[in-house]
Every structure is written in structure tokens, then in C-alpha cells.
Amino acid sequence: MKVALPKGVFDIFPYITDAKHMWRHTSLWHRVEDVIHEVCDLYGFSEVRTPVFEKSEVFLHAGEQSDIVKKEMYTFLDKKGRSLTLRPEGTAPIVRSFIDNSMNQRDDNKFYYILPMFRYERQQSGRYRQHHQFGLEAIGVRHPLRDAEVLSLLWNFYSAVGLQGMQIQLNFLGGGTTRQRYDKVLREYFLEHFESLSSLSKERFNTNLLRILDSKETEDQEIIKSAPSILEYISDEDQKYFDEILTALNSLDIPHSINPKLVRGLDYYTDVVFEAITTFGGHSYALGGGGRYDGLVAASGGPSTPACGFGVGLERVMQTLLAQGNITLPSSHKLRLIPVESQADSFCFIWAQHLRGLGIPTEIDWTHKKLKNALKTADAEKATFVCLVGERELLSEQLTIKDMSSRQEFSGSKQEVEQRLLYEIQNTSL
């Protein structure tokens, strides 16, 4: 029987020519990941890599009533009966690592990650059972300008990869006085309309009231539309905090708007929450989101510690780049050596190693195809330069390099060719 992928997953690999699936091309993922590393480095964030699986309790602390915890986790028992879960989201493992490694001894901890997540999602466009997330967590500081800084990093990432039509939507879920006031009013409002709510929202009424605002059920939409806004009940202190974030975004010319119905899918968010929205082809959809989660560290067994962060689904980023026509695969500027005769094999093997030591990406075609077919393969493999090596080249000690894009050639001794290749690579825009 032929082996095949399970549902909900996909391969990322280099030999993709179908435009529809170009978002899965290895080179594109490398380009986007390079942007992430560069942007995070500019802001002083360091990469963290947590295990693929954690003790299940790590995610239960993050919100027992969230859809992820209740319906979507890949949970299993190991051979000793311990409950383990494949990582469904990135924040809870970072918090676990923060506590485990006593990082609270530092005043300010700034982390980012690019990791696969696992959720038993219903099959639909843009949703996968293994997906990849760029996440960022800033733990230890509570300040409105820290929140704005995190948002500016997110915005710089979207700009650097070439996404268009982006906007940040924000809301303030509050904590303390603000949340108490709002919960009371919201509960009374939904109680008046309880019989008209969907079965899912009726369940959430007693477990996570705010999540009703996030309902996608048809029967809930008119009720949600008329629900009171939390911004009508925000305390003076919280309003000042929120205003400072908005002022900072204005100062950086980051497009944004307030969405008083915005809540997040995980239970641990407090105070400011946000989503990055793109509008394309008449549709709006989120490419990432996050907020402040000042209570999660303490809920996970650590000291009371403020924190904020976000997560970005990279599959949607790649697919949106494709839809917007902004996918450009980076050039590798590689040289392909083609030994025309077997007596040139040893020369190509040794010279290729020397070229790589000079920083010139070099590969060798060992197939000994007919010359015409070998050049076709070099073209298909996106080789920038090609060098044919046969008996004539070995005897004359003169080599010819062909530029596959301009179809121009240059010849010389081995040393002359090396210098020309280095010049071409260093002076050509990648």
C-alpha cells in the first residue's frame, strides 16, 4: 500500500512549480523566517525552543474552557500513564519554561519562537492540524509602551515580508474594577436574551461569558451586535493605560481601530487584546493576534508576573503573500559543476570543496546525462552559474562559466574564475 500524509498536514519542500502551492516552497519559508529573526533581533528578543509535547496540565492552566483545551488538543498517555499533550499554542510552554528556569530573577524577559503547533482542527481552508506559529512573549514588565513596542514589532514584521492592507484592531478587556463592572452588565444583558442564544453560547454563559462575543453562530450575531461595550465601563486608570497605547500607535503611523467586541480564543488574556487584520479580495481575516496576560504566570504556579505577547500563523501569512502576488523566491546564486567525462569527476569534487570554503554555493551534477539534458536540469534547479568540465578544460587549465540568466560567459584560470564568481555574488542584489 502506498504511504500518504494524514489529513490536515502538508510538506514544505523545494521542488514546487504549481503556483497554487508555492506558499509551501522551502525558500519562501526561509525568507520569512529570516525576516522574523532580523526583526526580533532589532528589538532585543531572543529565540526560545520548547519541547513538542508538555505535561497536559501546562495547557489546562491556560484556560480549561477554551476551545483548544476542550476540543482540539492531541493528548495521550505515555507508557507510565502520564498525560502528555502535543503543543497546541506557544504561550503556556514559554510560561512553563520561565517558571522552570527561574527566569523571574530577571526584570525583563523577551522571547520569540518559530515552532509547529498541533490542533485537531476541522478541515477547512487555511486550517491545519500541524501549523507553524511565530510567537513573541515579553514577561516581567507592565507598561503601555511595552504593549505598543510589541505591536510595533508585529507591524514591522508584516511590513518587512511585504503584506499589504494590514490594520491592527484593539480592545481592552480590563481587569479588576473594569472587568467586574462589565461582567455584571454583560451577564444581565445575555440573561435577557438567554433563550435565543446558541447552545454553545448558553454553555459559555456559565463558564466564560466574554467568549460569547466571539461566537460565529448565526443565531448569536444580532444579540452580540447590540451587546454593551466594555469601553463604556472602563475605569479611569484603565482608560489612561489604553489611551497611551493608542497615542503611541498614532505616533508610529500604525493603522489601527478599536473593536469593542474583540476577545481572544484563550482564557488567559486580560487588559489590552489585539488582532492583525488584512482585507483582500473583499474579505477580512486575522493573520495574528495577542494581548496582555498578567495572571497566567501565577496561575501556572509561578510568582505574580505581568506579560504580553502575540502569535502569528505562518501558513496564513504565506498564503496571503501568494494571494497578493508578493511571493518572490530568493536567489541562491549557486554554481553547478557538470563533469562532462568521468575523468573530470575528481577535479570537480576537490574544486567544489574549495569553492564552498570561499563562500560560493556549489553543487555537482553526478548523473553524467547528455549535455543538453544536464543544462536543462541546471536551469530547472535555478542554478545561477554553470561550469562544464571535460578533458579540454583539464588539459588547458582554462574554465568557462555561463551565467544562466544573461546567457553570457566568462573564461579564465581557476583562480581568475573564482575571483569573478566572488565579485558577481557580492555585487548582485539578492
Curated annotation (Swiss-Prot):
Q: Which reaction does it catalyse?
A: tRNA(His) + L-histidine + ATP = L-histidyl-tRNA(His) + AMP + diphosphate + H(+)
Q: Where in the cell is it found?
A: Cytoplasm
UniProt GO molecular function: ATP binding; histidine-tRNA ligase activity
Keywords attached to this Swiss-Prot or TrEMBL record, sorted alphabetically, are: Aminoacyl-tRNA synthetase, ATP-binding, Cytoplasm, Ligase, Nucleotide-binding, Protein biosynthesis
Q: Which GO terms describe its cellular component?
A: cytoplasm
Keyword ATP-binding among record annotations: yes
Task: Spell out the CDD domains in the cross-references.
Answer: HisRS-like_core
Its GO biological process annotations read: histidyl-tRNA aminoacylation
Which Gene3D superfamilies did the record assign? Anticodon-binding domain, Bira Bifunctional Protein, Domain 2
Matching entries from InterPro entries are given as: aa-tRNA-synth_II, aa-tRNA-synth_II/BPL/LPL, Anticodon-bd, Anticodon-bd_dom_sf, His-tRNA-ligase, HisRS-like_core, HisRS/HisZ
* A Pfam family that the UniProt record links to this protein: tRNA-synt_His
Highest taxon listed in the record's lineage: Bacteria
Q: What is its EC number?
A: 6.1.1.21
Q: Does the keyword Aminoacyl-tRNA synthetase apply?
A: yes
- Quaternary structure and interacting proteins, as annotated: Homodimer.
Can you tell me which family this protein belongs to? Belongs to the class-II aminoacyl-tRNA synthetase family.
Which PANTHER family is this protein grouped with? HISTIDINE--TRNA LIGASE, MITOCHONDRIAL-RELATED, HISTIDYL-TRNA SYNTHETASE
What HAMAP family does this protein's entry cite?
His_tRNA_synth (MF_00127)
Q: What is this protein called?
A: Histidine--tRNA ligase
Q: What is the lineage of its organism?
A: Bacteria, Pseudomonadati, Chlamydiota, Chlamydiia, Chlamydiales
